[in-house]
């Protein structure tokens, strides 16, 4: 049908453009909120819990959590492919890190567990080892063998006299004798 001076197609295009503008505004508002929350978290100063025991200090906040992972790990930040800015890769937890001081920075390689309960390692660093840890842009890339691991955890680090830093960790492989049991590992 048509309205004098207008075509249905033109009206439909105008509505689609209005919807795209509304979605873009929603996307930008949500992204700004996520960025603000992330910036507040990673810049937050940790606080000593007083009175302590006189030997070491405990701190109020954990140095790394799932919320410390970069937003671009968790979200597709492209409004064309993720207009509602939905989380695409859920992080369940960040924990059990190996740590070392290297080049005047405190470096941790943490176990990062996805919502699928599978883990990978990622490096984060801080100037003081107490707060302001930031993950490097990319997780650790692990070489695969002919018998691939399904999970990795419990990394520990040591600087060797040869100048390299070595990480020793545990890994799991699928127990092929139990193909229907997704929890079976060796």
What does each model-identified segment do?
Residues 3-96, 100-150, 158-186:
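Beta-rich carbohydrate-recognition and catalytic domains
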């Amino acid at each position: 049908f048509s309205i004098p001076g207008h075509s249905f197609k033109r009206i439909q295009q105008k509505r689609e453009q209005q919807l795209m503008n509304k979605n873009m505004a929603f996307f930008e508002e949500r992204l700004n909120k996520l960025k603000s929350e992330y910036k507040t978290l990673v810049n937050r100063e940790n606080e000593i819990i007083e009175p302590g025991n006189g030997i070491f200090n405990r701190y109020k906040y954990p140095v790394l959590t799932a919320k410390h992972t970069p937003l671009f790990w968790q979200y597709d930040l492209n409004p064309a492919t993720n207009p509602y800015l939905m989380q695409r890769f859920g992080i369940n937890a960040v924990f059990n890190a190996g740590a070392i001081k290297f080049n005047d920075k405190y470096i941790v390689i943490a176990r990062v567990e996805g919502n699928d309960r599978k883990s990978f390692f990622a490096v984060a660093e801080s100037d003081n080892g107490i707060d302001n840890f930031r993950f490097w842009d990319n997780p650790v890339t692990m070489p695969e063998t002919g018998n691939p691991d399904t999970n990795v955890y419990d990394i520990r680090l040591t600087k060797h006299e040869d100048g390299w830093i070595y990480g020793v960790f545990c890994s799991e492989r699928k127990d092929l004798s139990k193909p229907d049991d997704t929890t079976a590992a060796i």
